[in-house]
A protein has these predicted regions:
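Bacterial N-terminal signal peptides
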Residues: 1-6
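Extracytoplasmic ligand-binding site segments that recognize negatively charged/polar headgroups
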Residues: 12-13, 19-29, 50-54, 66-197
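Short, well-structured alpha-helical segments in soluble
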Residues: 57-64
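Sec/Tat signal peptide C-region and signal peptidase I cleavage site
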Residues: 7-11
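Class I S-adenosyl-L-methionine
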Residues: 33-37, 60, 83
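Short, polar/charged alpha-helical segment
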Residues: 17-45
């Protein structure tokens, strides 16, 4: 999601906070931002701050004195938290009509969806002949100490993984799932780079 901060930073440049992988050399950021500058006739200052949870925490800490104009890259897991801090200015994009209605999650237009993705596991197809098809498959003892996950306290993908298990197993069953998965975990990392880097 893209959001406009309340009381944005007053500067000649437009400051955008985003997550690292969006603005990485292999991410879409460099191309998107260059085209945006050309289209709007403005100069962007893009600040990459880790994953989207880290970016949101920075904006919360700066609420009294915002240093950015736009936050690009919140995911669904962080929206409710962000709304509780009253950080965003409503903005009705003229392009919102092109966005499928099931992706328009905020009737107050505090956020504008710009992409979506799926939660999935990355695996080495040369080492693993047949990929697991479900969360339940990951409980198989053949995966003992072979699974790396991201911490939901420090990682947006980790939080999405936690929410995925709650959606599948319910409030009553997700903790049992995690207990059963524990022997198969090699590591719980702070974020994307440590898990996949």
């Amino acid at each position: 999601f893209v959001t406009i901060l309340s009381n944005p930073a007053a500067a000649e440049d437009l400051t955008i906070y985003t997550y690292d992988s969006f603005n990485n050399e292999w991410g879409p950021g460099p191309i998107v931002f260059k085209r945006f500058e050309k289209q709007c006739g403005c100069k962007l200052k893009v600040v990459s701050l880790g994953d989207s949870g880290t970016v949101l925490n920075r904006v919360i800490l700066e609420k009294a004195n915002p240093q950015a104009d736009i936050l690009l890259g919140l995911n669904n897991s962080e929206l409710e938290k962000s709304f509780s801090y009253d950080l965003w200015e409503p903005y009705l994009s003229p392009l919102l009509a092109k966005v499928p209605t099931d992706l328009r999650v905020d009737k107050k237009n505090r956020v504008t969806p710009f992409d979506y993705g799926f939660v999935a596991f990355v695996y080495d197809s040369q080492k693993l002949g047949k990929a697991p098809k479900s969360l339940h498959d990951l409980l198989d003892p053949k995966y003992k100490r072979k699974i790396i996950i991201e911490n939901p306290k420090t990682s947006s993908p980790g939080l999405s993984m936690l929410h995925w298990t709650i959606a599948v197993y319910g409030e009553e069953g997700y903790l049992d799932y995690w207990k059963k998965l524990q022997p198969n975990l090699l590591s719980v990392t702070d974020g994307w780079s440590a898990a996949y880097g």
